[in-house]
């Protein structure tokens, strides 16, 4: 069963200090940047990396790359080779596998033995927002840590204002008498809402990309960078659409209750 923790780092740090930290952790969350930040916080503690730094000779990253945004078996084998070498600093080694759900079946199978029997003092942190897109054999060999976190979009004032306008628009559509008098205005309002939504998503995605790329713990090649940006933009869009779906559902439920009373 996944651990359900709003901030797991203190608990996991204590497990590491006690020598009981599981060698394979699967970090689950709704937003990859948030998952990565919390996994990196634990990584810094284990490897003794200062807060303002992200690099360490015993820290290795594996990311999707290319237009297909996949983790290839070739890159996976390179990581396995690094983990099987002696520690550069004489301590622990950590592998961060970003968007682990993007591992191709061949890559996941190649990594399975390392996950089952990792080299001594080696930890593997798999990060994902889509755990059920991973091979069950990979998931079952990890301690799952479910992370809670408020999406950045919920802090966006422009988005909150948009939701208020959207709610008013929906209520207007549900008002049959008002709709009989004016069927044109709601159509034009829909165009405005759509344009506003696309603008907010684009701006939030741009900000998230800039922030993540600025904080990257390593220099990426162009294929990895393109894959990362694509993943961030898809994640931001999915987050907004998820909230929009929830808002629409809550309005419909509220309206049905009002009809019953």
Question: What do these predicted ranges mean?
Answer:
Residues 94-96, 125:
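Structural motif
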Residues 50-64:
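Conserved catalytic segments around the Walker B and adjacent sensor/switch elements
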Residues 102-103, 117, 133:
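Residues immediately C-terminal
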Residues 20-21, 55-57, 88-91, 118-121:
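Short loop/turn elements that form and flank the Walker-type P-loop nucleotide-binding site
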Residues 10-16, 73-94, 102, 106-113:
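Conserved alpha-helical scaffold flanking the Walker A/P-loop in AAA+ ATPase domains
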């Amino acid at each position: 069963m996944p651990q359900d923790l709003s901030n797991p780092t203190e608990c996991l740090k204590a497990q590491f200090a006690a020598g009981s930290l599981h060698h394979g952790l699967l970090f689950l969350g709704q937003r990859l940047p948030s998952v990565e930040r919390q996994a990196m916080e634990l990584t810094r503690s284990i490897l003794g990396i200062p807060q303002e730094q992200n690099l360490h000779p015993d820290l290795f990253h594996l990311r999707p790359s290319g237009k297909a945004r996949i983790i290839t078996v070739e890159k996976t084998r390179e990581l396995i080779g690094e983990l099987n070498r002696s520690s550069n600093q004489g301590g622990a080694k950590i592998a961060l596998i970003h968007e682990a759900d993007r591992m191709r079946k061949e890559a996941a199978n190649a990594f399975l033995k390392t996950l089952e029997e990792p080299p001594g003092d080696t930890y593997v942190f798999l990060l994902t927002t889509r755990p059920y897109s991973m091979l069950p054999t990979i998931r079952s060999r990890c301690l799952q840590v479910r992370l809670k976190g408020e999406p950045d979009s919920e802090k966006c004032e422009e988005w909150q204002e948009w939701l208020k306008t959207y709610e008013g628009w929906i209520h207007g559509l549900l008002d049959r008498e008002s709709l009989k008098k004016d069927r044109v205005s709601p159509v034009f309002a829909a165009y405005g809402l759509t344009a506003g939504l696309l603008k907010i998503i684009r701006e939030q995605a741009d900000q998230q990309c800039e922030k993540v790329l600025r904080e990257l713990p390593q220099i990426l090649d162009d294929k990895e960078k393109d894959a990362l940006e694509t993943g961030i933009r898809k994640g931001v869009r999915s987050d907004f659409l998820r909230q929009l779906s929830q808002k629409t559902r809550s309005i419909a439920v509220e309206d049905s209750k009002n009809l019953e009373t």
